[in-house]
Amino acid sequence: TADNMLNALFYFLLRNPQCLKRLEEEVSCVGATVNELSDDRLAKLPYLNACINETFRIAPAFNGGILQRVSCGATVDGVYVPPGVAVSVDHYTLGHDPQYWVKPDVFNPERWIDPDCKDNFKASRPFLIGARQCPGRQMAYQMFRVCVAKLVYLYTFEL
């Protein structure tokens, strides 16, 4: 999961050099040395977190969901789903659905920090939600923040 997400994130950053430049500028303001790039500081960087969230949305490492049983009947998109039926969500399709995202196929980290954005952020569930949420969620975010920030701080990337 981690290597796929790092590959995807740097792929999108390199395909969108303006995003990489903005991220480099944000990370460079955190500290004078690479050792100062702690997760406590990095967690407060809006653009770094937006890049990570946008990568989770547009290229989810885990596409399937955990099957859950419908507790009571419900009509979804005109189709009745009776009680007891197992359902799951396809994360890739959800992350690319124009019903939830403006320009869903465009890598746009700004959508995560723009207060006027019309996207439905509840449609991005890279770690699931509720009782079945991944227990390693916070650790994964910490690892991605530190790894991405240190790579961007130490190296120059280009295509």
UniProtKB/Swiss-Prot annotation:
Enzyme class: oxidoreductase
GO biological process: biosynthetic process
Disulphide bonds in the chain: none
Reaction(s) catalysed (UniProt annotation): 2 fonsecin B + NADPH + O2 + H(+) = aurasperone B + NADP(+) + 2 H2O; 2 rubrofusarin B + NADPH + O2 + H(+) = aurasperone A + NADP(+) + 2 H2O
Residues that hold heme according to the record: C134
Swiss-Prot/TrEMBL keywords: Heme, Iron, Metal-binding, Monooxygenase, Oxidoreductase
Pfam family, one: p450
Pathway listed: Secondary metabolite biosynthesis
GO molecular function (one): oxidoreductase activity, acting on paired donors, with incorporation or reduction of molecular oxygen
KO phenotype (gene knockout): Leads to the accumulation of the monomeric compounds fonsecin B and flavasperone.
EC number: 1.-.-.-
InterPro entries assigned: Cyt_P450, Cyt_P450_E_grp-I, Cyt_P450_sf, Cytochrome_P450_monoxygenase
Cofactor(s) for this UniProt protein: heme
Origin: domain of life: Eukaryota
Family under the similarity heading: Belongs to the cytochrome P450 family.
Function (record text): Cytochrome P450 monooxygenase; part of the gene cluster that mediates the biosynthesis of aurasperone B, a dimeric gamma-naphthopyrone. The first step in the biosynthesis of aurasperone B is the production of gamma-naphthopyrone precursor YWA1 by the non-reducing polyketide synthase albA, via condensation of one acetyl-CoA starter unit with 6 malonyl-CoA units.
Protein's name according to its UniProt entry: Cytochrome P450 monooxygenase aunB
